[in-house]
Regions:
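Pol beta-like nucleotidyltransferase catalytic core
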Residues: 2-104, 108-129, 139-141, 147-409
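Catalytic toxin/effector domains delivered as secreted proteins or via bacterial secretion systems
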Residues: 132-135
Length: 409
């Protein structure tokens, strides 16, 4: 009888240990999904202890922003690592348990099998990122859906679109704010470098003896609908008598552009900020901000709607092709501006006398996308999830996503 009692106690002890082990294991699985790699497996036990010691480990007290990989796994692409206004940006995946946000470029899950097999804490914010237009993603990379980012995998979106959770424009504070700070001095310095070249036989209704040149650098000639359309529009401008210096892969003269002196590059009055997509929401790239504005050139815009440009650009800073019935009408207007320094300088009025809207834009552009993400993350902004990143990203105008070259109404 005594022996039976001892065995009963032993069996109860073993069963209790098994039940406890099962409970601990189930709790572990419910809190996070196990990683595939051994190093991450080892991290889970230590991370579990850290989470217990720290208490609630919300995104607001984690300061790492983990970029899962470089776009297309190309090391020279993507955001830089380092300080991001209170956060630290990194590509080091060992920081995954300590990341408040994990940013995925749309190409980053190409090599991953779903459902997600790596570590994920319920308090982490998973962010979908893109700086490419849907037109390019569909027709250039043949991605017609973002299935791996669907089913509530993503919490926030971070793109150039103003309806993103995190607005990440191409413009950065080093462009617009620096220009406004320098004001008239910046304008005088830039305009002093503009030159004119002789042109004759243009059959214009206004007197002209000299005209400035227009610059365009492009290497995407026919990949997309927008690529083809902008080439045709530029050809029409040249045919109408507008001198345009065209460089890049489309014209087999990349090296010639690199050989231009700094004075030559600064001499252009206008830049063709022609995007490779038409009417994609808010799609304004470095063509507008760096190639034109930063160099003191008036951007001549084709691609984004005029409404979108007015929303994102300084007041009165650009010329839009939609305001002209034909390329010939635009060419005539640009040639006129070259003869009238007062009229040309009006396009820089936003620098000397910025209106309220322009000043508000300048404040907006102080923060880059990752800096804005950090601020939102640390402020513990309410979390949510997107049922479908595909639905968000491809929710565009027919003009934007179509492959048909003719203009679609």
């Amino acid at each position: 009888m005594r022996l039976f009692a001892k065995w009963s106690v032993f069996v109860i002890f073993i069963l209790s240990a098994i039940v406890a082990a099962i409970y601990i294991y189930s709790t572990e699985v419910s809190n996070k999904t196990f990683p595939l790699d051994i190093m991450s497996l080892r991290r889970i036990s230590s991370s579990k202890k850290q989470l217990t010691n720290r208490g609630a480990n919300t995104s607001s007290n984690r300061t790492y922003i983990l970029f899962w990989d470089h776009p297309w796994s190309v090391p020279t692409e993507g955001f830089s690592e380092g300080n991001m206004g209170g956060c630290t940006g990194t590509y080091d995946r060992s920081k995954l348990p300590d990341a408040g946000a994990v940013v995925f470029h749309y190409s980053n899950l190409d090599g991953e099998s779903m459902p997600w097999k790596h570590y994920r804490d319920p308090e982490q914010i998973f962010v979908f990122s893109s700086h490419e237009s849907p037109s390019y993603v569909i027709h250039g990379e043949h991605r017609h859906a973002m299935n791996k980012f669907d089913d509530h995998f993503i919490n926030w979106t971070m793109t150039y679109r103003t309806d993103s959770d995190v607005f990440a424009p191409y413009e950065q504070s080093k462009v617009m704010n620096k220009i406004i700070d320098e004001g008239g001095k910046w304008i005088d310095n830039k305009l002093a470098k503009k030159k004119k070249v002789a042109v004759a036989n243009l059959n214009l209704s206004f007197p002209i003896s000299f005209v400035s040149l227009q610059l365009w650098v492009v290497s995407n000639c026919a990949l997309l609908r927008g690529s083809k359309m902008r080439m045709k529009y530029t050809d029409a401008l040249v045919k109408a008598g507008l001198p345009v210096d065209r460089f890049g892969g489309c014209f087999n003269n990349k090296d010639e552009f690199k050989e231009l002196s700094a004075d030559d590059v600064e001499a252009y009055k206008f830049y063709l900020a022609f995007e490779n997509a038409q009417y994609c929401k808010d799609y304004m790239t470095e063509k507008f901000w760096y190639n034109a504005i930063a160099h003191g050139r008036v951007p001549v815009v084709w691609g984004p709607s005029k409404e979108d440009v007015e929303k994102l650009a300084p007041t009165g800073s650009f010329i839009h092709t939609d305001d002209f019935k034909t390329p010939a009408d635009l060419a005539k207007y640009l040639l006129y501006l070259d003869t009238n320094d007062t009229a040309y300088r009006e396009y820089f009025k936003w620098v000397e006398n910025p209106d309220e809207k322009t000043l508000e834009l300048a404040k907006t552009y102080v923060l880059t996308g990752p800096h804005r993400l950090c601020k939102m993350m640390l402020s513990n902004r309410g979390r949510k999830s997107h049922p479908s990143a595909s639905e968000f990203f491809y929710n565009e105008t027919t003009n934007c996503i179509s492959s048909q070259e003719n203009v679609i109404k």
